[in-house]
Curated annotation (Swiss-Prot):
Family as reported in the entry's similarity comment: Belongs to the [NiFe]/[NiFeSe] hydrogenase large subunit family.
Gene3D superfamilies recorded: Cytochrome-c3 Hydrogenase, chain B
Protein name: Uptake hydrogenase large subunit
Keyword Cell membrane in record: yes
Keyword annotations of the record: Cell membrane, Membrane, Metal-binding, Nickel, Oxidoreductase
Localization per Swiss-Prot or TrEMBL: Cell membrane
Length: 596
C-alpha cells in the first residue's frame, strides 16, 4: 500500500520484507526492516531502537554534580561527550563560569574524540562496506604502491610493504580464522574497488587500528583515563604545574609536549592517509550516490568548540549552529534549545507513554515512562519479533522534531550548515573534494557525502587541536594556571529551583541534555542524543526519520546480502558487532551473517 509522507517520501510496504536485526549502536541496539519491489529497490524503511536506555530515570533525585559520571556511561565509544554535555547543563542551570584554560582543555578533549571516533568509524566500522578484503589477495603489490604514492606521500607505501602485508593476509585467510574480516560479503557485485585499492585500504585499516590508541592518550592526560575520563562542574579536574613532575595528575611541560606530538601525528594521519583514502575509494563509487535522505532537505547543528570560555553564542562556536529546512540552503535558521516551540519529542510510534500522545513535549517537560506494546499487525511476540508494525509503536527511540520537522544531524549536517553559511573553512574543502572527483554539489547529499564530511571534519578537528593547544600553552606561560571555578560548588549557594541546558556536537551529531534542579537534587533530566534524531520513528504526522529516509529508493544487488542497507546505515556512524538476519515475507530466515 502506497503512502506519501509529509516530508516527501512515497512509502510502499507491499513488497518483500527484509529484516536486519540487530544492528548495534552506541546508545543501544538497532533493527532495520525494509520492503523491496520486484526490481529490489527499497520502497519502505523502518528503523527501530530495540533497547531502553532509561538513564533519565536513574538520575532522578541524584546530586547534579554527579550527573556527568552517569550520563558518560551511556556510550563507551564517543566517551566523554555526554559528560561534557552534562556539566555544561549544570553550569547553565546554576550560572557557573569556567576558566579559559578549562575551555581550551575541554575543546582539546572533545576534538580528540572527534578525530579518534571518525578514524575508528571509517576504518573499522564502515570501510568494509566499500572494501573487499578477499579481493586484496589478487592485488599486484607494485601497482598498489604506485596507487598509494599517487595519492599521498605517506611513507608506508613501498611494494615490499604491501607484498609483506598481502602475504600475512593470505595466511590469515587460509587459516580459516578471519577474525574481524569473518562473514563479510566478499565477492559481492556491490563492491567496486580494484584489488590494488582493496589492498591499500586493508593496510591502512591495520595502521589505523594501531594508531587510534595513541589519540586517546590525550584523554588520559587531561581526564585520568579512557574510556570515561573524569570531568568537573566548573572546569576540568587536572591542575597545572608546569615546573612539576606531573605527580597526582598535574599537567606539566612534559605532558604538554606529549600532547603536542600526538596532535602532530594525528594531523599527519588525517591529511596523508584518512582523507586521501576516502577520496580514492569515493572515485570508484561516483555513480553510487544513494542514501541522501534528509541531508539535502532538513539538517540541524547545535554548534560547538567555543572560542572563548562561557560564550556559547553562534559567533563564538567554531563548529556552526543552525537549521535548514525544505532544502533551502539560502536560509539558515537560528536554534534555541530553551524554546519549547522548537525542539519537541513525540512518542506515538515509540514504546513510551505521554499524557497526550498527539502532542510533543519539550525536553524540560519530558516524560520517560515505558509502554512496550506491539502494533496490531506485528508478527511474532514481544520477545521474538518477526516483523514490526510501523502503524503502531515500534521503537524505544522517541521522535524529536525541530519546529515539526524531522532532521538529520551529524558531520554532514554540520558541514551543510557551514556550507550554507558560506564559511570558507567548510565550503572550500567541500568544493575541492567534489571538484577533485568531478562531482556536482548535489553529490554531497548521499552516503558518500556523509562519509566524506566525516573525513573532512577530522582534518579540520586536527588543525583546531593545534590552535587550542598553542592557546593553552600561551595562556599558561602568561601566568594563568587556573583550571576550575568552585565558587558555587556547595549546594548552599544554589537557588531552590533551577533549570539549564547543555549541548555539544558529538561525533555522531547534535547532542543536548536538559536538567531541572529542585532542592539541590535532579528533579528531571532528559537527553536527546544524535541517534534519537537520526534513528527516530515516524511522528504523528507520518514524517519518517533520517535513517528511514536515507534507505528509500536504494537499489540492492542481492537482498540476501543487504550490503547497501549496511553501507548507508553505517555512514551515520553506528558501532556494531552483531548478527544480521534476512527474512522472507513469511518470516523464514534466508540468510544469517555477522555484521562487521
Amino acid at each position: 500500500m502506497g503512502i506519501q509522507t509529509p516530508n516527501g517520501f512515497n512509502l510502499d510496504n507491499s513488497g518483500k520484507r527484509i529484516v536486519v536485526d540487530p544492528v548495534t549502536r552506541i546508545e543501544g541496539h538497532m533493527r532495520v526492516e525494509v520492503n523491496v519491489d520486484a526490481d529490489n529497490v527499497i520502497r519502505n524503511a523502518v528503523s527501530t531502537g530495540t533497547m531502553w536506555r532509561g538513564i533519565e530515570v536513574i538520575l532522578k533525585n541524584r546530586d547534579p554534580r554527579d550527573a556527568w559520571a552517569f550520563t558518560e556511561r551511556i556510550c563507551g565509544v564517543c566517551t566523554g561527550t555526554h559528560a561534557l554535555t552534562s556539566v555544561r547543563a549544570v553550569e547553565n542551570a546554576l550560572g557557573i563560569t569556567i576558566p579559559e584554560n578549562a575551555n581550551s582543555i575541554r575543546n582539546l578533549m572533545q576534538l580528540a574524540l572527534q578525530v579518534h571516533d571518525h578514524v575508528v568509524h571509517f576504518y573499522h566500522l564502515h570501510a568494509l562496506d566499500w572494501v573487499d578484503v578477499v579481493s586484496a589477495l589478487s592485488a599486484d603489490p607494485r601497482a598498489t604502491s604506485t596507487l598509494a604514492q599517487s595519492i599521498s606521500n605517506w611513507p608506508l607505501s613501498s611494494p615490499g610493504y604491501f607484498k609483506d602485508l598481502q602475504t600475512r593476509l593470505k595466511k590469515f585467510v587460509e587459516s580459516g580464522q578471519l577474525g574481524p574480516f569473518k562473514n563479510g560479503y566478499w565477492g559481492s557485485k556491490a563492491y567496486k574497488l580494484p584489488p590494488e585499492a582493496n589492498l591499500m585500504a586493508v593496510a591502512h585499516y591495520l595502521e589505523a587500528l594501531d594508531f587510534q590508541k595513541e589519540i586517546v592518550k590525550i584523554h588520559t592526560i587531561f581526564g585520568g583515563k579512557n574510556p570515561h575520563p573524569n570531568w568537573l562542574v566548573g572546569g576540568v579536574p587536572c591542575p597545572i604545574n608546569v615546573d612539576g613532575t606531573g605527580a597526582v595528575g598535574a599537567i606539566n611541560m612534559e605532558r604538554l609536549n606529549l600532547i603536542s606530538s600526538i596532535i602532530d601525528r594525528l594531523i599527519e594521519f588525517n591529511e596523508m592517509v584518512y582523507l586521501p583514502d576516502v577520496a580514492a575509494i569515493g572515485s570508484f563509487y561516483k555513480d553510487w550516490l544513494y542514501g541522501g535522505g534528509l541531508s539535502g532537505q532538513s539538517v540541524l547543528a547545535y554548534g560547538d568548540v567555543p572560542e572563548h570560555a562561557n560564550d556559547y553564542s553562534a559567533k563564538s562556536l567554531k563548529l556552526p549552529r543552525g537549521a535548514i529546512i525544505n532544502g533551502n540552503l539560502s536560509e539558515v535558521f537560528p536554534v534555541d534549545h530553551a524554546n519549547p516551540d522548537e525542539i519537541q519529542e513525540f512518542v506515538v510510534h515509540s514504546w513510551y507513554k505521554y499524557p497526550d500522545e498527539t502532542k510533543g513535549l519539550h525536553p524540560w517537560d519530558g516524560v520517560t515512562e515505558p509502554n512496550y506494546v506491539l502494533g496490531p499487525n506485528a508478527k511474532g511476540t514481544k520477545t521474538a519479533i518477526e516483523q514490526l508494525d510501523e502503524g503502531g509503536k515500534y521503537s524505544w527511540i522517541k521522535a524529536p522534531r525541530w519546529k515539526g520537522h524531522a532532521m538529520e544531524v551529524g558531520p554532514l549536517a554540520r558541514w551543510v550548515v557551514g556550507y550554507a553559511q558560506n564559511k570558507s573553512e567548510f565550503k572550500d574543502p567541500v568544493d575541492k573534494f567534489l571538484r577533485d572527483l568531478n562531482l556536482p554539489t548535489s553529490a554531497l547529499f548521499s552516503t558518500l557525502g556523509r562519509t566524506a564530511a566525516r573525513a573532512l571534519e577530522s582534518v579540520w578537528a586536527g588543525r583546531q587541536m593545534r590552535y587550542f593547544q598553542d592557546k593553552l600553552v600561551a595562556n599558561i606561560k602568561a601566568g594563568d594556571s587556573s583550571t576550575a571555578n568552585v565558587d558555587k560548588w556547595k549546594p548552599e549557594s544554589w537557588p531552590k529551583e533551577a533549570k539549564g541546558v547543555g549541548f555539544t556536537e558529538a561525533p555522531r551529531g547534535a547532542l543536548a541534555h536538559w536538567i531541572k534542579i529542585k532542592d539541590t537534587k535532579i528533579d528531571n533530566y532528559q537527553c536527546v542524543v544524535p541517534t534519537t534524531w537520526n534513528g527516530s520513528p515516524r511522528d504523528p504526522k507520518g514524517n519518517i526519520g533520517a535513517f528511514e529516509a536515507s534507505l528509500m529508493n536504494t537499489p540492492m544487488v542481492n537482498p540476501e546480502q543487504p550490503l547497501e542497507i549496511l553501507r548507508t546505515i553505517h555512514s551515520f556512524d553506528p558501532c556494531l558487532a552483531c548478527s544480521t538476519h534476512v527474512m522472507s515475507p513469511d518470516g523464514q530466515e534466508l540468510a544469517k551473517v555477522k555484521v562487521r
